[in-house]
Regions:
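Glycine-rich phosphate-binding loops at beta-strand->alpha-helix junctions
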Residues: 82, 177-180
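Active-site-proximal alpha-helix that buttresses catalytic centers in soluble enzyme cores
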Residues: 2-25, 31-100
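Active-site signature of alpha/beta-hydrolase-fold catalytic machinery across serine-
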Residues: 89, 180-184
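Short beta-strand scaffold positions
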Residues: 77-78, 151, 172-173
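Phosphate-handling substructures
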Residues: 50-51, 94-154, 215-218, 227-228
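Acidic, low-complexity terminal tails and accessory targeting/binding regions
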Residues: 1-23, 66, 99, 107-119, ...
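Active-site metal-binding loops of divalent metal-dependent hydrolases
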Residues: 30, 175
Length: 228
């Protein structure tokens, strides 16, 4: 007597990176020191280079604990010291020396470097309103053009992906950079749609050739921050 053939089950697909793809955890640096008019930041190639604030060092420790078991093969930082300072706890846990990727440094804010962007944002400067209305950093006098910024970010991500096929890497970078990466990945019409990643947050991108896939944005669960 024949038995009924077992019914085939078709489960929902679970994502896995394509062969040769690179998983990139983009970590925004921890909170940096506050800007003070009578104590300007040091500059590196014309860009403000503040240390981490005490809160930022706590962010760095929490990031290190969160990512310590994520099979990360390489770490990258920028030329601005708040990124290697944020990477330091994870680097110590993994026994890895971070490599410097200069092109993932923050957008250059021209005449508004050295804390002036923070001040003018707080004061409600009319150019800040124009910046958000037009979705362009280069309305700020002397700022890097959007074309230059977007081009160097895309080139840098492409280089890191090409150097790390089938690997996971962590990139310690800046809020403007993360916003630009995810705007490009999603082809967002609003260029600032992903601006505002929190200090110490982790975002996750998968790069397979020219295809950039968004996996998560602004994960702060390790920071124990409520929604807000």
């Amino acid at each position: 007597m024949s038995t009924p053939e077992q019914e085939v089950e078709y489960r929902q697909h679970r994502f896995s990176p394509p062969p040769g793809a690179t998983e990139i955890f983009l970590v925004r640096h921890g909170e940096s020191a506050p800007a003070k008019g009578d104590n300007p930041f040091e500059l590196v190639d014309g860009q403000a280079d503040p240390d981490l604030a005490p809160e930022g060092r706590d962010h760095a420790e929490r990031v290190g604990r969160r990512l310590a078991d994520e099979r990360i093969s390489a770490l990258y930082v920028t030329t601005l010291r708040r990124t290697p300072q944020t990477a330091a706890p994870l680097a110590a846990k993994l026994g890895l020396t971070p490599e410097v990727e200069p092109d993932l440094r923050e957008i250059h804010l021209g005449e508004w470097e050295n804390g002036l962007f923070r001040r003018y944002t707080y004061e409600g400067h009319p150019i800040v309103e124009q910046l958000w209305r037009e979705q362009r950093w280069d309305v700020i006098p002397g700022a890097e053009t959007m074309e230059s910024f977007g081009g160097r970010i895309r080139a840098a991500i492409g280089r890191l992906a090409a150097a790390n096929p089938d690997r996971r890497i962590a990139v310690f970078t800046h809020g403007g950079v993360i916003g630009e990466v995810f705007a490009q990945a999603s082809a967002a019409k609003n260029r600032f749609a992903f601006l505002g990643a929190d200090n110490g947050s982790i975002s996750h991108l998968v790069v397979s050739g020219e295809n950039w896939m968004v996996r998560r944005f602004n994960d702060t669960s390790h920071l124990q921050s409520p929604f807000g």
